[in-house]
Amino acid sequence: MIFKETFKMGLKDIDKQNQIKNVTLLEFFENIGSYHSDLAGYGADYTKEHGRGWVLLDWKVQVLKRPKYGDELEIHTWAKTMNKATTYRDFEVYNQNKELCAIATSRWTMVNIKEGKIDKIDADIIKAYDPEDKNVFEEKEVTKLKAPKDFSNEIEYKVRRKDIDINGHMHNIYYLDLAYE
């Protein structure tokens, strides 16, 4: 099932060049993925009720044309390959002129939050998402980034309460913010 949602670009979504920030793009992806999970019955309410939730493992994003302030974006997402431990979710971003602006893929796992362990993605979950056989990138796997041997900049950071997400850990978006610093 392909899920679609419209987002309007506001001031907080743009940089000094009047273009979408990378963090904003990831936030849009996360939100539409969450709305799709809500529809499938495995979203935020499920996490609170069952103590199980989706955890992002990695992303791959390609921006083809940067949206600007005021643009209305239609974002499409769908679950694809699912196995007992991980699943992939793809995204396409279109502007109001129906131009493809960005594509992305992400890899997720289901975690038992109380135990901090990976939980099985069972047949009921797979059926609820109705995975698509459609890929935005030719290669299926997301290449893992390698940490540089030397860092030009280091800061000490103490996790704040506002950094904690529904799964009880630092939200993945804040890591990108820290990397920019």
Which role does the model predict for each range below?
Residues 1-56, 103-105, 112-181:
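Hot-dog-fold acyl-thioester-processing enzymes
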Residues 98-100:
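Residue-level signal for glycine
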Residues 12, 82-83, 96, 109-113:
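Short coil/turn motifs at secondary-structure junctions
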Residues 60-96:
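Hydrophobic beta-sheet segments that form the core/acyl-binding groove
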Residues 89, 106-107:
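Short loop/turn microsegments at loop-to-beta-strand junctions
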